[in-house]
Regions:
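Cysteine-centered motifs
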Residues: 10-12
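Extended, well-ordered protein cores
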Residues: 32-299, 308-532, 536, 540-558, ...
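A glycine-biased, small/acidic residue-tolerant capping/turn segment at secondary-structure junctions
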Residues: 730-746
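Cationic, low-complexity basic patches in intrinsically disordered or flexible, solvent-exposed regions
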Residues: 19, 24
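C-terminal accessory extensions/subdomains outside the catalytic/core fold
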Residues: 749-771
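Short, charged, amphipathic alpha-helical segments
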Residues: 712-720
């Protein structure tokens, strides 16, 4: 069987000889169904796949396991959404929709690598690249004026932000550091921690009124129904914002509003405060996942900070169609076509702002790229842990670390970061060699909470009321709004809550650690969830378990105290805190969140195994393109494969799959012990070399085991060949570095060029492919 591979996708051939199936009839169910789906994604993990997937396919063929790829990259999703614009040979299936169906099947087994959660600038960049490759994809209409353009914008919205995860996450999340990773982290603590001065001026700033937290209303519906979202203007007319949304019996639905006048006032106050305190100003949002609300909040900050520029040049900005939601970068791009004198005038006015305002935190000080250049450059779940790790500081225009006011406008989750800052100021930095762990059980199934709110988030078209009305005409929730206010509604279904509670009890039982539900009874949504948690906990045997419900600030104080004593805790949280905490604690503990084990037990019995939480690492790609060195650490992929193989073993009674799981886990331990993760420096071990060492240690473990003599006999010569040629292979891999790489594209690289770049060792390739 050969899987067809569309050109330009990070795919590798899956060749599986049908006749070999007859040799393994004792493995249980039909071999053709013993499939692991390996997602084809973007940027650094996509490049790493070219090196690692052929190895997986070669090693596991004898277990009757087929690795099949599904393209969920940004470029792939764009192409799948516009088949009518493409020639037959250019079309690809809508793999994301396929996966959305597969996650409901009990045998489904998916390795999910990080993909781009696209901002509008990234979307436009991908479209431009595809157009340059001959794909007739239309331009993205930022300000649609016709029905056709509005329809086009809605189609592109399907690939913006975190379009992938809500589709795949048909289960709740179990995230923790693998035991081997934790042992290694304590024995070899990372050295990224910087001291916390007791006189640090750094702090989190949040709104005190007018935010989502303060306005939130929530209700649980008793019976299944349909609701509509409508805007009732002060002068009477009613506009339907969303015609129909289905609610299940027992579902929780919320409505909250961000008052943009209060938001802008908050920004202005913090700008002055940062200047007076002589600290950096930084903004921390999630414009990728919260793809409707947060870019608008980001844009308001841009327009307030650069208010003098936008006021003075208002007519020019309007003519150019500058959208502040895309950041200062778009302004620079669009003024590039102005006459030199006018462009220079605007650029000079921007520099004047920097002289009169507070200093901004920088993304790249050498290039003058600030926190406000692009909405996706500073993402809260990744940025705030680094602020804390770096002693409460961020990089300034002088390329040095400085204290910062970290603006997180909404109170719902901002307070947890301020609590960590206070803890560090009082007790000093954390010690990775002794600190405990905080695992997470996260409520995320079926688009739970804020991360499923995109299609129910609206900018108020005027002054009036936005309300949620059921099909009998009953008003469930209503929120007063002013023009431009951000209205957001979230749904949380009952079955995922029941599953979440069960998973929390199971993890508490398995570990003996306290399990803390982070829920705030003063918050409308959490009050509804608390009632359900108490009800469903009563369905489980909790004798001997320490299970508590605490507001987030109390919960994080409790967890931090245990961390400093070297004790482990389970955080049981909603969807957003799941995202934030599974970056925060691993970055402090291990130096990165990419080393986390992330298991999603799908609600119908399948398994989704996510490979870390560190994003798709565009800076790694930049280094690879410049000097042929890729520093992506595939440890997340390695760790995810262990429970994936175990799932195959359980589902199909495949003993060989369990052998692969056991030996891979042993190999990961050896890999960590020998410190074979990629270096950051060119001509040293990179991603490809780390894959070689995983292959070597895994082959040696398979050769040493006696549980499966057939696999042992197969891997004895492989292990010998890899060990015998170690120096030669590493020489070939490292020797390929040190020069610019041409892979024929960024968002959709050329498959053949990338395969050559990522598999430069003929010796290694011959051993693997010869299997």
């Amino acid at each position: 069987m050969v899987f067809a591979i569309p050109d330009g996708i990070c795919y590798c051939f899956v060749a599986f000889v049908e006749s070999s199936l007859s040799q393994h009839k004792n493995l249980g169910k039909n071999m053709a169904t013993q499939k692991i789906i390996y997602t084809a994604v973007d940027e650094a993990p996509a490049l790493a796949t070219y090196s690692f997937l052929p190895l997986l396919q070669a090693y596991t063929k004898r277990a009757g396991i087929v690795f099949e790829t599904k393209d969920i990259s940004l470029a792939g999703r764009i192409l799948a959404n516009f088949p009518e614009n493409l020639a037959e040979s250019q079309r690809i299936p809508d793999y994301l929709s396929e996966l959305g169906q597969l996650v409901r099947l009990p045998e489904t087994n998916i390795i999910k690598l990080p993909n781009i959660s696209a901002s509008i600038p990234q979307l436009k960049g991908a479209i431009k690249e595809l157009q340059g490759k001959g794909y007739a994809i239309p331009d993205y209409p930022e300000e649609p004026k016709t029905d056709t353009e509005r329809e086009l914008q809605a189609r592109f919205a399907k690939v913006l932000g975190s379009a992938v995860n809500p589709v795949l996450r048909e289960g709740n999340s179990d995230r923790r550091a693998a035991a081997s990773v934790k042992r290694f982290g304590r024995k070899n603590p990372h050295k990224l921690m910087k001291p916390w001065p007791s006189d640090s001026k750094s702090q989190v700033a949040h709104m005190t009124d007018g935010d989502f937290y303060g306005s939130e209303k929530s209700v649980t519906v008793n019976n299944a129904c349909n609701v509509r979202f409508e805007f009732v203007a002060d002068n009477g007319p009613i506009t339907i914002l969303k015609e129909k949304t289905g609610l299940q019996a027992g579902e929780v639905i919320d409505a909250a509003v961000m008052n943009v006048r209060a938001l802008r006032s908050f920004y202005a106050d913090q700008i002055e405060r940062a200047k007076n305190d002589e600290v950096l100003l930084s903004l921390h949002l999630k414009a990728t996942m919260m793809k409707v609300s947060d870019p608008v909040m980001f844009g308001h900050c841009v327009s307030v900070f650069y208010q003098d520029v936008f006021t003075k040049h208002a007519e020019v900005m309007k003519e150019l169609g500058v959208n502040v939601n895309n950041g200062l970068s778009e302004l620079y791009t669009k003024i590039g076509n102005l006459p030199d004198a006018k462009r220079a005038e605007i650029e000079a006015d921007i520099q004047t702002v920097y002289k009169t305002r507070c200093e901004l935190a920088m993304v790249d000080s050498s290039k003058g790229i600030t926190n406000l250049h692009l909405p996706n450059n500073v993402i809260i779940d990744a940025s705030m842990p680094v602020v804390i790790r770096d002693g409460g500081r961020m990089w300034g225009p002088d390329d040095r670390l400085h204290d910062t006011i970290a603006m997180i406008p909404d109170r719902s989750y901002a307070t947890i970061y301020q609590t960590v800052i206070e803890d560090c100021r009082n007790h000093g930095t954390f010690d990775p060699a002794t600190m405990g762990s905080v695992a997470n059980v996260g409520l995320m199934a079926q688009k739970a909470e804020e991360y499923g709110s995109h299609d129910k988030t609206f900018m108020a078209p005027g002054n009036g009321m936005i309300r949620i009305v059921d099909d009998t005409g009953k008003i469930l929730l209503a929120q007063p709004v002013k023009k431009g206010d951000i209205f957001r509604s979230c749904q949380t279904k009952d079955a995922p809550i029941q599953d979440w509670v069960k998973l929390a009890v199971n993890r508490a039982r398995a570990t003996g650690a306290p399990a803390i539900f982070w829920l705030d009874e003063k918050r409308a949504h959490d009050k509804e969830i608390i009632a359900k948690v108490k009800r469903y906990l009563a369905n489980h045997d909790t004798n001997g378990l320490d299970i508590r419900i605490m507001p987030p600030v109390e919960a994080i104080r409790f967890s931090l105290a245990r961390i400093r004593r070297g004790e482990d805790t389970i955080s049981v949280t909603g969807n957003v805190l799941r995202d934030y905490l599974t970056d925060l604690f691993p970055i402090l503990e291990l130096g990165t969140s990419a080393k986390m084990l992330s298991i999603v037990p799908l609600m119908n019995g399948g398994g989704l195994f996510e490979t870390g939480a560190g994003g798709s690492a565009p800076k790694h790609v930049q280094q690879f393109l410049m000097e042929g060195h890729l520093r992506w650490d595939s440890l997340g992929e390695f760790c995810a494969l262990v429970p994936s193989f175990e799932h195959v073993s359980r589902t199909f009674h495949n003993e060989k799959a369990q052998v692969f799981a056991t030996t891979l886990d042993e190999a990961i331990g050896t890999f960590l012990e020998n410190q074979k993760s990629p270096s950051r420096k060119v001509h040293e071990l990179d991603t490809r070399g780390s894959h070689f060492y995983l292959a070597l240690y895994w082959a040696e473990s398979l050769a040493a085991q006696s549980r499966d003599p057939e696999l042992q006999a197969c891997f004895v010569p492989v292990a010998h060949a890899l060990r015998e040629n170690e120096a030669k292979i590493i020489g070939e891999l490292n020797g390929a570095q040190g020069q610019p790489m041409d892979i024929g594209g960024y968002f959709r690289p050329d498959r053949k060029k990338t395969a050559r770049a990522m598999r430069p060792s003929a010796t290694f390739n011959n051993i693997v492919d010869g299997m």
